[in-house]
Amino acid sequence: MAPNLRKSHPLLKLINNSLIDLPTPSNISAWWNFGSLLGICLLTQILTGLLLATHYTADTTLAFSSVAHTCRNVQYGWLIRNLHANGASFFFICIYLHIGRGFYYGSYLNKETWNTGIILLLTLMATAFVGYVLPWGQMSFWGATVITNLFSAIPYIGQTLVEWAWGGFSVDNPTLTRFFALHFLLPFMIAGLALIHLTFLHESGSNNPLGILSNCDKIPFHPYFSLKDILGFIIMFLPLTTLALFSPNLLGDPENFTPANPLVTPPHIKPEWYFLFAYAILRSIPNKLGGVLALAASVLVLFLVPLLHKSKQRAMTFRPLSQFLFWTLVANLLILTWVGSQPVEHPFIIIGQLASLTYFTILLLLFPIIGALENKMLNY
């Protein structure tokens, strides 16, 4: 009998074991779709980004007009640009839901997969930040100035570090050029990290909504989940194209329609919506270094999640107290996102400080306590 090429060829064998014959738990829900959605987001962003890069000029005098030129004069340039800008938003929606899924169902107990995932999140955040600077509008320029300036809070080396990153004494042409280079490079780094992420995942296999071992009941990835993933792609592309075609500037900042001007500061400097929760945490501490540390901690705290798992059950499926805490955390993040978009004045300052305190308290204190309490209640 002739050998099956799909199972014997060195390259096809890899693809086969990852996407075709992969044994998958039969009961994984739609929450397990977000991994493949992130993959398709990355592909879409790389493709649209490549097409945009062919028409973009990384120079302070030309960047803004080159983006305008792409939208006006390039065939479907407006569509490519709108898909790329809003694709970033969908990328973040998917990654936040993906992290939330991992948190709810205890997937973080696959430590290597979880840790590479956090590194992926940090790389994605860096990519989105440098990308936001490229159109060289007002919010691009001032966002770059404010965020890079935070590094100057690092004792002793801070100022040198910032000037080294800027390539001068302020955000200027060298900054834009290197940000473009970084924005081109990082997505390929993300693709590489995603492969590492998958390699670690396939070591242990997928978790499932019950949080129990599923070796006794697994089904092949293809056709069951390949088809389910395609349905997921369609469901995601529908709102993405709707947004890009009907309301492309809904999530953007109107300030970015004004070319960058170092002499005029916008009244409210704020990042894109997907960074607002972290921005609110940064602003809630009235000290530069303290704010920077809190900002870093807001994402890096995820590394501690596997160490703070005290429950004897993996998923939250059968843990109502932890579920209540989880949804409180979600609501808390939404409040932080809203506060981050508001000006720094009376009610918002205290709301932001309370929400920031609650965020860290829930993650570092309440989750382990409630986990241990649930063990007690179930006589474990």
UniProtKB/Swiss-Prot annotation:
Residue sites binding a ubiquinone per the record: 202
Annotated positions binding heme b b566: 98, 197
UniProt keyword annotations, A-Z: Electron transport, Extinct organism protein, Heme, Iron, Membrane, Metal-binding, Mitochondrion, Mitochondrion inner membrane, Respiratory chain, Transmembrane, Transmembrane helix, Transport, Ubiquinone
Subcellular locations according to the entry: Mitochondrion inner membrane
Residues binding heme b b562: 84, 183
Gene Ontology terms, MF aspect: metal ion binding; ubiquinol-cytochrome-c reductase activity
An annotated GO cellular component: mitochondrial inner membrane
GO biological process, one term: mitochondrial electron transport, ubiquinol to cytochrome c
Pfam families: Cytochrom_B_C, Cytochrome_B
Membrane topology: Multi-pass membrane protein
Cofactor: heme b
Regions that span the bilayer: 34-54, 78-99, 114-134, 179-199, 227-247, 289-309, 321-341, 348-368
Quaternary structure note: The cytochrome bc1 complex contains 11 subunits: 3 respiratory subunits (MT-CYB, CYC1 and UQCRFS1), 2 core proteins (UQCRC1 and UQCRC2) and 6 low-molecular weight proteins (UQCRH/QCR6, UQCRB/QCR7, UQCRQ/QCR8, UQCR10/QCR9, UQCR11/QCR10 and a cleavage product of UQCRFS1). This cytochrome bc1 complex then forms a dimer.
Protein name: Cytochrome b
